[in-house]
Amino acid sequence: MDKFKIRGGQPLSGSVTISGAKNAALPILMASLLPSEKITLSNVPDLHDVDTTLELLDCLGISHSNLNNNSVCIDPTTLNHFKAPYDLVKTMRASILVLGPLLAKTGKAEVSLPGGCAIGARPVNLHIEGLRKMGAHIDVENGYIKASVEGRLQGAEILLDTVSVTGTENLMMAAVLAEGETVIENAAREPEVIDLANFLNSLGANVRDAGSDTIHITGVNKLHGGEYSVMPDRIETGTFLVAALATGGSVRCEKTDPASLDAVLKKLEEAGATIDKGDNWIAIQSHGRPKAVNIITAPHPAFPTDMQAQFCALNAIAEGTAGIRETIFENRFMHIPELRRMGANVESEGNTALCHGVDELTGAEVMCTDLRASASLVIAGLVATGETVVERIYHIDRGYEGIEKKLQGLGADIERVTA
């Protein structure tokens, strides 16, 4: 398996171009089976999870062709299967997002229960119960969700018990071809949900109020083709900004969206950074050792859970002591034992971690456990004295496009070693 070798101690400096958002690209790719004509997507990140999603569409009979510059053309008119097999779904929890659109388009769907990062239960009950309210008959047997509906799905009022991004997206995609009006209450408000709604509307859907906690969808008979550009990745942006501050550097992120990062930017300023921003760029300037900052993760527009591990690495070398409380996922502190191997003074119990900043980290062999934990270990390696070896980086390849090349462009001493 590939690994990273990092020799830390160099401040990051320069500009980096941000890729398309993984968490927007995946649902948009799944939604690409809904229209009756070809679509072309641009700013699609080159990631393992994107490749898996395209493989999944292939399994459904949907053909695609990769164009230049992170673009892909998808032809949903060749859809001729309705089963998402375990071999593909086991590697990626987002595979559950095929359930709603596949059921809406074909009237039946068989989707294996999902896999992906080992960071908690992430139950699919919300998806199933919502689709049942829309008239679907659903059984869960032999590890598969087996869904069917006679005729079209029916519009319904759906109250989500907990805020769920994928639950909101799955039901939104199902509702665009349903008969009548669907209302999703307690909906997720993440920017990626808005991007999915904008994509669907560009194809002729009628989705309103995405970005609020109540989304209204009026079903249409069919969707047409079109072209769409995936939004920039706010988590990749945040990761580079944290890396810049942790190393005492100065970095400008290009082709990003500052409006989607308010909570993160406020915490970076609280940690001592100077932030400048324009319509599609963010620049960060460090001023000595960062200050430790308290973090509480919560659904958007609060602090995103996908940035928690990176700030844990930042707090590990910051001045002072700060707490981190994780309210979204259980079991999301798996990076902490690895950071301790590098000399971090971080303790955790339940969903809370306490970070006591140390003067320096030292290089060590560490192991990735999930996508965002991987990013925290890379940041720690960039700061540490000596050499850090980061193992099992297939986790980071799931969500960061060419991260080592982008870091090299900012002056980092990092290399990918192929086993």
From Swiss-Prot:
Pathways per UniProt: Cell wall biogenesis; peptidoglycan biosynthesis
A Pfam family hit: EPSP_synthase
Keyword DNA repair among UniProt keywords: no
Top-rank lineage group of the source organism: Bacteria
Compartments, as annotated in UniProt: Cytoplasm
2-(S-cysteinyl)pyruvic acid O-phosphothioketal carried by residues: C117
Catalytic-site annotation from UniProt: C117 (proton donor)
Keyword Cytoplasm appears in the UniProt entry: yes
Binding-site residues, phosphoenolpyruvate: K22, N23
Enzyme Commission no: 2.5.1.7
Single GO cellular component term: cytoplasm
Key words of the record: Cell cycle, Cell division, Cell shape, Cell wall biogenesis/degradation, Cytoplasm, Peptidoglycan synthesis, Pyruvate, Transferase
A GO MF term: UDP-N-acetylglucosamine 1-carboxyvinyltransferase activity
Biological process terms in GO annotation: cell division; cell wall organization; peptidoglycan biosynthetic process; regulation of cell shape; UDP-N-acetylgalactosamine biosynthetic process
Binding site for UDP-N-acetyl-alpha-D-glucosamine: R93, D306, I328
The reaction(s) this protein catalyses: phosphoenolpyruvate + UDP-N-acetyl-alpha-D-glucosamine = UDP-N-acetyl-3-O-(1-carboxyvinyl)-alpha-D-glucosamine + phosphate
Family classification: Belongs to the EPSP synthase family. MurA subfamily.
Described purpose of this protein according to its UniProt entry: Cell wall formation. Adds enolpyruvyl to UDP-N-acetylglucosamine.
Cited NCBIfam families: murA, PRK09369.1
UniProt protein name: UDP-N-acetylglucosamine 1-carboxyvinyltransferase
